[in-house]
Amino acid sequence: MKKFKYIIVLFVMGLISFSCTDLDEEIFSEITTDNYYQNSNNIYAALVNNYAKAFSTGWSDARYFLQEVTADQLMIPTRGKHGYNGGEYVRLHEHKWTVEENFVYNGWAAPFQGIALCNNTLSDFENLDFSTFKLTEETKNEYIAELRALRVWNYMFLIDFFRHVPIVTDIEEVKAQSTPLEVFNFMESELLAILPDLPKNRGVSRFDQAGVASILVRLYLNAEKWIGISKYDECEQMAQAILDGKYGEYSIDSDYRGPFRSGINGYRSKENIMEFAIKKNYFEASWLYNMWMHYQDRYSLDNDWQGWNGGNLAPSRDLYGNLYQDKLGMPFEKFPDEDIRKKAFRVISNDGYYEGFFLMGTQYKFDYEKGYGFTDEVITGTEEYNGKPLVYVDQVGRFSEGETGLAKGSHVIYGEENTGYRLIKFPWLPQSKDLFQMNSIPEIRLAEIYYSLAECKYRSGDKIGAARLLDAVRKRYYKAEDWSKFSYESNISKLTDDEFVDELGRE
């Protein structure tokens, strides 16, 4: 045994004696600020890379999990052997998460990664002579203003999630945490400072004056919650300025689908102040599809994506089909039956027009012969309903287990593959028509500004003013013969605190 130990020691000593002591690396090539920026295209690419990161931060993972799954409209149930993930979704649902959750880490890391990228690009741009690349000083100021806007946009998540966060504007310096008020004041001052340097109505996927003004609206609307100081007057003034066209010309789309099909066949909704343009195989909203779609939805929606069958709308009905009586939740049944959005999603033409916002009930195969709609062939499940019709239900329970399953009750851990209606607010259009993953994802809509201004007026006691603003948007959701019944201005007593919250949820 001793001899064996000595052999090991000698072997290790031999490795040490022959190890390299010169640890300086030999660099054969590298990309630095000095050699990357060769032309104006390189500068533009560096700028838009920050938007790509912003989309990733804003439209996947942490934002949905921390802001939506913790609320009462969306859920990610355990579906038999699928989706428990160590209980992380259950803890979000029950508000029992810990600081060790991946979502909490990502809620901190993703925005700060975006901030670091902004700071790095800002440092590059501030030290570049744009005229060398035949770009004007005005263009340089615009690009820098966009990066500062994106940096604040990332801070919007941080102040909402954590309140106390470092204000980081330098790529070298490590900062201590700042107070919520300090973070708020930094965000506000940055946005106000860059407004004049941005154009109006810039177009798709870029911040402009209205985009920055809209972020200020969000900032002021949430100020009381974030810093304990009411800023509703400032919110009202900024929102009204946007509606008055001070920062660009926008209008409410007459078609409720318009903002969400922007980008299809060249259509651009005038309602979208800021939208992220996506394109299949180049820049995709993959998480938005996969997280909420069933594995078999590809056969009804016409695409070749698998889907994860993760989440769905929170249920409106109990195990026996009765409506829940809770004030919160029940997102599907919060839509009146006369609301034209409350329909099963269905493509109705060859050019990608569709109706409805929900996958619900029995699922049927896409009609390739017509190029839209469905055939009579039923799609079948693969888990609890393997070989049986896939029928989405607005309930949570182990129905496939009969009375034994019902006895378990309705709980987030007792889902099945068909549990929950699926929201398709962002339409997944036919791949065979080259429309799949081609519609933009709207980050800021003019409707949000109308509703923010309405909230300010409602809080100040001007219910009629609030009702008119809400009605200006929601009139498109009802047939003319039904509108008088649902107009808030005509039925002002219906506009209560609870109804206002429900209407915000529907929009």
List each language-model region with its residue ranges.
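Conserved, well-structured interaction surfaces
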Residues: 39, 44-58, 80-162, 174-182, ...
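Bacterial Sec-dependent N-terminal signal peptides
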Residues: 1-29
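An aromatic- and glycine-enriched ligand-binding surface/loop that stacks and positions planar moieties
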Residues: 20-85, 192-193, 206, 210, ...
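Short coil/turn linking the two alpha-helices of tandem helical-hairpin repeats
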Residues: 159-160, 164-166, 202, 222-229, ...
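C-terminal substrate/ligand-recognition segments
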Residues: 105, 354-471
